[in-house]
Regions:
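Conserved, mostly hydrophobic/aromatic
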Residues: 9, 35, 94, 130, ...
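Alpha-helix-loop-beta-strand connector modules within alpha/beta enzyme cores
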Residues: 65-93, 148-169
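Glycine-rich anion/phosphate-binding loops
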Residues: 24-41, 65-78
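Conserved small/polar residues in nucleotide/adenosyl-binding loops
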Residues: 222-226
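Conserved anion-binding
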Residues: 100-103, 147, 153-200
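Active-site beta-loop-alpha junctions enriched in small/polar residues
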Residues: 12, 55-57, 96-102, 141-143, ...
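Structural preference for beta-strand elements that scaffold enzyme active sites
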Residues: 4-8, 49-51, 90-92, 136-137, ...
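Active-site mouth loops of central-metabolism enzymes
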Residues: 18-33, 107-121, 190-208
Length: 226
């Protein structure tokens, strides 16, 4: 059972302590040093898979989330350090711009809406940077159309063929994400709805459609002689 567990960890470069997350009871925002200690504790418990979520200082956020594209940003350097210390750890990193944008949205806003194609260009750069840093699994949570195919292509072209994509295929526009947004310090701007790119909870068929599209864009099948 332990081998199947994934521990989410929230981390910030702007703190030096372990702070409880009021909106997520039992979870904490870690400094880098204390995060490393937490990972060692988890390994001793037999938990080897970690999902990392950065809480980005407001000073590093902008309209386009450009810090997410910096190959030397905090999360990329942290991924490399973790993999150097604990190569047995399986690291999952999130691919979306919401921790990095002042709007708190998952993509780049043009004319008051998230520009899907412009955002895809940013996401593929972000994904490659995280893979190059040592991420074992890339987890796109942005819900842009066509992102899995674009990211898969970018990973292949950059030589990161073994990097796994774990897609957030079905992500609904819901207030239930509030606690998570608090944890990563993402504040949604007024007047812009994530319903532009996340799914309507009333549409019960769209989740299956989105999952099928992700499979078409990023699923790799090996042939068998059997």
């Amino acid at each position: 059972l332990k081998s199947k567990l994934i521990q989410p960890l929230f981390v910030s470069e702007s703190i030096s302590s372990k702070q409880p997350l009021e909106s997520l009871p039992g979870q904490f925002l870690f400094s880098k040093d204390l995060l490393i200690e937490e990972i060692e504790l988890l390994l001793n418990l037999g938990i080897k898979t970690i999902a990392l979520f950065p809480n980005i200082p407001e000073s590093l956020k902008d309209a386009d989330g450009t810090n997410a594209l910096d190959e030397k940003n905090f999360i990329c350097k942290l991924v490399s350090e973790i993999k150097d210390r604990y190569p047995e750890v399986v690291l999952i990193t999130d691919v979306a711009l919401d921790p990095y944008t002042v709007s708190g949205h998952d993509g780049i806003i043009k004319n008051d809406v998230v520009d899907n194609d412009l955002t895809l260009e940013a996401l593929k750069k972000m994904a490659v940077n995280l893979a190059e840093a040592g991420s074992d699994i890339i987890a796109p949570s942005d819900m842009m159309d066509g992102r899995i195919g674009v990211i898969r292509g970018a990973l292949e072209q950059s030589g990161n063929k073994d990097t796994i994509i774990l897609s957030y295929s079905a992500k609904y526009s819901s207030n239930f994400y509030g606690p998570f947004r608090d944890a990563i310090g993402s504040k949604k701007a007024e007047g812009i709805s994530k319903a532009n790119y996340q799914m309507d909870k009333r549409n019960i068929e769209e989740a299956l459609k989105e999952a099928e599209l992700d499979l078409q864009e990023g699923c790799l099948l090996y042939t068998s002689d059997a």
